[in-house]
Amino acid sequence: MNIKYFLLIITILGFLARSRVLVIAGLLLLTIYEFEIDFVFEFLGNKGIEIGLIFLLMAILSSLVLSPVDGEVIKDNLLSWQGTVAIIAGVLATKFNGMGLDLLQESPQFILGIIMGSLVGIVFFGGIPVGPLMAAGIGAVLFKIIEIIKG
């Protein structure tokens, strides 16, 4: 399939799924492709995830800057059972994200399935498409489980 048509399909699916993020990403990539600014693709391939993660982390941490929390409240929260669960979830999420990044670097063709799964999740389950790395990480874990079961 021609990459231009693929990007157009992704953009249209993003529009149908009401995913502004997917529409903007698709349109930007389509524009970059049409204007033959190929070095942008190389840059995004090499640094895009890192830059995106920096902005994501800044967005999350900015809430602490806007409404500072007392140190005692932070300590009480971290030492509660909910805080412990949150810490474990953070550890698992970062591990899964790392596994997902490895999977996508080794087998980039899986991104198509992740995009399709994300679209199904958005359209039918009201999901939010913010975690392709997490989706790939869950896929990597499921692949390992299936490999173990199959022997």
From Swiss-Prot:
Keywords, comma-separated and alphabetical: Cell membrane, Membrane, Transmembrane, Transmembrane helix
GO CC annotation terms, alphabetical: plasma membrane
Highest taxon in the source lineage: Bacteria
Places the protein is found: Cell membrane
UniProt keyword Transmembrane helix, yes or no: yes
InterPro entries reported in the protein's UniProt record: UPF0756_TM
Sequence intervals crossing the membrane: 7-29, 49-69, 84-104, 110-130, 131-151
Membrane topology: Multi-pass membrane protein
Pfam families with a match to the protein in the record: DUF441
Membership in a protein family: Belongs to the UPF0756 family.
Protein name: UPF0756 membrane protein Hore_21770
Organism: Halothermothrix orenii (strain H 168 / OCM 544 / DSM 9562)
